Amino acid sequence: MTAAADLYCVMGNPIAHSRSPWIHARFAQLTGQSLHYERRLVPLDGFAQALQSFAAEGGRGCNITVPFKLEAAQLATTRSERVQLAGAANTLVFDGGSIHADNTDGLGLVADITQGAGVPLAGRDVLLVGAGGAAAGVLGPLLRQHPRRIAVVNRTPARAQALVDSHAALAALQKTELLALDMQAPGADFDVIINATASSLEGGPVPVPASVLRPGSLAYDMMYGPAAQPFLDWATGHGATARDGLGMLVEQAAEAFLLWRGVRPPSAPVLQELRAAIAAGA
């Protein structure tokens, strides 16, 4: 790191798997920005101290991954509307002793669906599978795309209803029907199905029936790599178009980069390079 390079990082536990340093290094090269971005493994009980240490080093911003997104939102000085709605933050901006929290996950998901996959969300029927932090982080930006309907399903129905209730005002403003449905019988023929659960990681079956799919539906798993494969295989086996969350990863990083540097990096070539690197075993 040169003296002129601004310091950024991603904090999480675990963190060794993170592709964020590579992504942001490519963004910096493509936009002519001078920065250094690194991984930081944070003890489960040491997140607040890690933020203090990073700020003392002159850190300018950091991405936050599991399990610290809720704590990041709580510890920030100011919070974006997206963070206030989701209750979680994945991007922190350090400025003059203050910490501003934002959440770019939903923006990344929307960009990858509408631009990467070329599927518009306006006027569509969307099924959001899961009601945890991942789902909460994306529901607001999904609603802002003016879909006709978003149905939320979850193993614990009360959590799905709570997520719906917390976003009811925004849904009404967007004139979108937002409701919680039975996970085992959510209805049929959704245009877009988004898996925001860790069902594949847990070794369980896909948590919704195949009746939610129709030929031409987009089935999107917010995970990527082996974790997403069971869901993707299930979707293609029932005639849907399947897409993993690697594009979401790159797009949310691009949004964070824009917040930090004031420059929007090109995401498409970086995603193409990243897919090639992963396919080659890098």
Swiss-Prot record:
Top-rank taxon: Bacteria
Organism for this UniProt entry: Acidovorax sp. (strain JS42)
Broadest EC class assigned to this enzyme: oxidoreductase
Protein name: Shikimate dehydrogenase (NADP(+))
Catalytic activity: shikimate + NADP(+) = 3-dehydroshikimate + NADPH + H(+)
Binding residues annotated for shikimate, in chain numbering: S18, R19, S20, T65, N90, D105, Y224
Purpose: Involved in the biosynthesis of the chorismate, which leads to the biosynthesis of aromatic amino acids. Catalyzes the reversible NADPH linked reduction of 3-dehydroshikimate (DHSA) to yield shikimate (SA).
Involved pathway(s): Metabolic intermediate biosynthesis; chorismate biosynthesis; chorismate from D-erythrose 4-phosphate and phosphoenolpyruvate: step 4/7
GO cellular component: cytosol
EC number from the UniProt entry: 1.1.1.25
Keyword Oxidoreductase: yes
Complex formation: Homodimer.
Active-site residues, Swiss-Prot/TrEMBL: K69
Family classification: Belongs to the shikimate dehydrogenase family.
NCBIfam families (UniProt xref): aroE (TIGR00507), PRK00258.1-2 (NF001310)
Sorted UniProt keywords: Amino-acid biosynthesis, Aromatic amino acid biosynthesis, NADP, Oxidoreductase
GO molecular function: NADP binding; shikimate 3-dehydrogenase (NADP+) activity
One of the protein's GO biological processes: shikimate metabolic process
InterPro entries: Aminoacid_DH-like_N_sf, NAD(P)-bd_dom_sf, SDH_C, Shikimate_DH, Shikimate_DH-bd_N, Shikimate_DH_fam, Shikm_DH/Glu-tRNA_Rdtase
Binding site for NADP(+): E81, G130, A131, G132, G133, A134, N154, R155, T156, P157, A158, R159, M222, G245
